[in-house]
Amino acid sequence: MTRVKRGNVARKRRKKILKLAKGFRGSHSKLFRTANQQVMKALRNAYRDRRKKKRDFRRLWITRINASARQNGISYSKLTGQMKKANIQLNRKMLAQLAVLDPQAFAKVVEVASQAQ
């Protein structure tokens, strides 16, 4: 059986980690052990925050819709209920965009939803 020297494998593994740690501050991008810890932490945070981003955006949309709805004299929960009755199928993202970019159109949506009781 031939002898396997692991120098190349180890160097490749360490280079991969240091490449991922590029841009980190201080020893976090220079020393393998600290770089490895920071890369693992960064990957953990990235995984968690990809899921958290969806919740954050939904909360932002609801906040924006609620603010605009209250300017039009109705609460968010009542607006969503009336929109369901009026069969208006705009999702929260679209409604929030309307509320920010085109307040007149949003007011029209509120008006149409309010009439369908």
From Swiss-Prot:
Biological process according to GO: ribosomal large subunit assembly; translation
Taxon lineage: Bacteria, Bacillati, Cyanobacteriota, Cyanophyceae, Oscillatoriophycideae
Main function: Binds directly to 23S ribosomal RNA and is necessary for the in vitro assembly process of the 50S ribosomal subunit. It is not involved in the protein synthesizing functions of that subunit.
GO molecular function: rRNA binding; structural constituent of ribosome
Protein name: Large ribosomal subunit protein bL20
Entry similarity comment: Belongs to the bacterial ribosomal protein bL20 family.
Keywords from the UniProt entry: Ribonucleoprotein, Ribosomal protein, RNA-binding, rRNA-binding
Superkingdom, natural source: Bacteria
GO cellular component: ribonucleoprotein complex; ribosome
